[in-house]
């Protein structure tokens, strides 16, 4: 998949602006200097670390940067209080974390498995 992405980036003339990093996410995020800003991040990884990814990215997010998070509705399981497996609880906690975060604006879309688009408040 990365080869296909690289081809499209090159065709669009943005290949010099995108850094593709394939490594454990938290480890990689911790290596990015605090001063280096991230314009866009897409979170779709182990659900138990969603809050950790979010906070690590937020600290490096540019003024108009966006964080897009996948699986926030988890096939509707997050609203069913009788479902309490580890991933469902983690996503529920993440959604509550973002809801309570006064630093951001968030729109949750019911596309697919649910996607949140999060922007740092101006």
Identify the residue ranges that each predicted region occupies.
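S-adenosylmethionine/decaboxylated-SAM
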Residues: 1-122
């Amino acid at each position: 998949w990365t080869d296909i992405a690289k081809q499209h980036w090159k065709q669009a003339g943005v290949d010099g602006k995108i850094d593709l990093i394939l490594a454990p996410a938290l480890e990689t995020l911790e290596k990015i200097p605090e001063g280096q800003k991230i314009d866009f991040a897409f979170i779709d990884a182990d659900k138990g670390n969603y809050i950790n990814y979010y906070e690590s990215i937020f600290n490096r997010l540019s003024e108009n940067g966006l964080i897009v998070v996948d699986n926030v509705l988890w096939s509707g399981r997050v609203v069913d209080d009788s479902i309490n497996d580890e991933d469902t609880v983690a996503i529920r906690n993440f959604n509550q974390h973002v809801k309570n975060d006064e630093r951001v604006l968030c729109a949750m879309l019911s596309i697919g498995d649910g996607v949140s688009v999060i922007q740092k408040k101006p």
